[in-house]
Amino acid sequence: MLTLPFDESVVMPESQMCRKFSRECEDQKQIKKPESFSKQIVLRGKSIKRAPGEETEKEEEEEDREEEDENGLPRRRGLRKKKTTKLRLERVKFRRQEANARERNRMHGLNDALDNLRKVVPCYSKTQKLSKIETLRLAKNYIWALSEILRIGKRPDLLTFVQNLCKGLSQPTTNLVAGCLQLNARSFLVGQGGEAAHHTRSPYSTFYPPYHSPELTTPPGHGTLDNSKSMKPYNYCSAYESFYESTSPECASPQFEGPLSPPPINYNGIFSLKQEETLDYGKNYNYGMHYCAVPPRGPLGQGAMFRLPTDSHFPYDLHLRSQSLTMQDELNAVFHN
């Protein structure tokens, strides 16, 4: 039995024909592909018109996508500064103007709403305008106070109503609310704090602490008084008697016949009694120079010192003036000796 090799061309002529046909088809497909792409690009270019801004944007994107530099070196990836062109500057300027216009309109609307809220809130003044935060706080308190009235079902007291309105508000706003509701601000402060607004204590008590001396005791017949009001009876003419043998004619009246009352004090730096509203210190200095030859009975300047009540604290100016008087007496004594 004879056998022929499989590779000979005589045996399988059809297979060679198929092979040639397949190769020709593949070559034709490769040639047709670039032609079809070029036709599609031409057709799209005719039908679609590009805007100048879009062209510049696409060109910039293409430039950004390039990974190689002009020299062929790889570029650094990341944020790069874009080229400042006229179109880009105009776009940035237009966006900024739009943002400013939106913010301006928003603020105008907010201010109009706050003005309408100020007309409703119980606080009106022709000269003073509430701030934004004070208006919102007062509106919140007003809504809460009205809701409490509806919940209780009774008409509240005016004082409590104002107290509820003024929670967390500043002092000028509180005064405006009290004036709008025809309520005295002083009485409102007294009611709100639960204690009197005016105190009998001196404003200088924080700077000058009280001095307690064993010599200053409660006068007879006045044991029920507090320690803050206690005062030892003292003859204010002792300074006059220390320089002269006889007593002063002005001190002929008995000492403290009526109830005790501390002398009025002017806190402007001047200690004055009821008879004297102002003191001329230049005359006191001349008076000391004129009568300095008379020797005092006690130590130098002892009679010139005043004994003060325990609760009366005087400013620093008064202490300086009393010290200046004693120093003047010492200088006079030195010059005459």
Curated annotation (Swiss-Prot):
> Which GO biological-process labels does this protein carry?
axon development; dentate gyrus development; positive regulation of transcription by RNA polymerase II; sensory organ development
One cellular component term from this protein's GO annotations in UniProt: nucleus
The yes or no answer to whether the keyword Nucleus is present is yes
Q: Please name the GO terms that the record assigns under molecular function.
A: DNA-binding transcription activator activity, RNA polymerase II-specific; DNA-binding transcription factor activity, RNA polymerase II-specific; E-box binding; protein dimerization activity
For region Disordered, the annotated ranges are 43-82
Q: Output compositional bias ranges, type Acidic residues.
A: 54-71
Q: InterPro entries per the record? A: bHLH_dom (IPR011598), bHLH_transcription_factors (IPR050359), HLH_DNA-bd_sf (IPR036638), NeuroD_DUF (IPR022575), TF_bHLH_NeuroD (IPR016637)
Q: Which SMART domains match?
A: HLH
The protein's UniProt keywords, in alphabetical order, are: Activator, Developmental protein, Differentiation, DNA-binding, Neurogenesis, Nucleus, Transcription, Transcription regulation
bHLH domain residues: 94-146
Q: Kindly state the positions of the motif Nuclear localization signal in this protein.
A: 80-86
Where mainly found?
Answer: nucleus
Q: Name one Pfam family in it.
A: HLH
Q: Which cellular compartments is it found in?
A: Nucleus
What does it do?
Answer: Activates E box-dependent transcription in collaboration with TCF3/E47. May be a trans-acting factor involved in the development and maintenance of the mammalian nervous system. Transactivates the promoter of its own gene.
UniProt-listed PANTHER family: BASIC HELIX-LOOP-HELIX PROTEIN NEUROGENIN-RELATED, NEUROGENIC DIFFERENTIATION FACTOR 6
Give the multimer and partner information. Efficient DNA binding requires dimerization with another bHLH protein.
Q: What name goes with this protein?
A: Neurogenic differentiation factor 6
What organism does this protein naturally occur in?
Bos taurus
